[in-house]
Amino acid sequence: MAIEVEVESRQLDVWLEQQRIGELYEQGNLWALHYDPVWRDNGFDLSPALPRNAGEIQDGGSQRPVQWFFDNLLPEEGGRQLVAADAGINAADAFGLLQRFGPESAGALTLLSPGQQLPPPELRSLSDAELSARIQALPRQPLSHGAPKRMSLAGAQHKLAVVLEQGQLWEPIGQAASTHILKPDHEQVDHYPHSVVNEWFCMRLAGACGLPVPEVQVRRVPEPVYLVRRFDREGEGLHVRRRYALDGCQLLSLDAVFKYQQASSLTLRQLLDVTRTPAVTRLALLRWQLFNFFIGNADAHLKNLSFLWGEKGWELAPHYDLLSTAVYRAPDWGIETLVFPMGSATRFADVTKAEIGAFGQSIGVPVRLTLLELERLAKDLWREAQALLQAYEQGITHEVDPGEARLLRQIVYGPITDALAWASRWSRS
């Protein structure tokens, strides 16, 4: 005779600033979201798959929109293993991790235990010496170890949510919100050296070419760290407002494990369908795809696209996580797989003008306009890449590090040079 075991239910209250959205439940690994009546009448849907008019959304055995949505707030891969081990929680227990790290998760939502209240906003100074010690403790301990606020940020890399105010780093406490994301160099320095300056260079290059990107900078503590201003925050210091944003997986109701597998022109069109300005957004997505091709970014997946909610609907957020992965695969980087195929091309070296035109057409951009955008971006990118490299080498932007300078030259005269040549062909023959 089977013995029935009653599984305890767990609950978290979901907040956006001072507004209560509802309750998140989990029992027997099945999740449910119950909207607060006030939010149901006056708020907005957390995502297209979580409509307010349903009142309560319950996951099933195979379709789990609630779990997929909230799981996307947590770190991935090794980052999740590390914060879970540091907290003494099983990495497979996503709800338990949200209970622990919900007060400062990725995005704008705050997840609190029933009745829990956060202390008033406060900032604690984060000295360069303390930050350096935390970096040196990687990967044994996460960067958030010792932080006054339990924090969890989505993604696979080590990162820390901080406040940058007049050149000083601070850590948020209580109701205080972070303004910047901080990343050190990749822990596997032999395989991925100088990732900080790599991302800084590619983000600055994107901005110089007219792509929307947030402010970025490099700080040395003395280890280099990359700082990027959060596009989902407004204000400074203790007066920061959270803006609601979703990444591509959340907007499409996909588990994070599908961020590569489901990347296609079809999913881009599905994202376009929910934006308030699809014509503007499809051109922005075309430029984003072309830029990632030119720098050799083989990690431009669905979670690296985000959308901000406004009064009139969803709009594409500024770009982030732009870096050259190809520079670490030289000299045969052309065999790297494109995350979003272009036409029939699935590898970087297979891309031609014809394939780029086909990709543009597949997301609704006419071939002629696609090729005009290609020509403009190619011209701007080559000019700006050389100018930014020269500025770095002359010490205008940073104190020159020989290893960093060598990597930046490899990006410009490796992947960028190769990709520009491939994109100038009409065919592979």
Stretches with model-predicted labels:
Residues 1-429:
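Phosphate/dinucleotide-binding and metal-coordinating scaffold of catalytic cores
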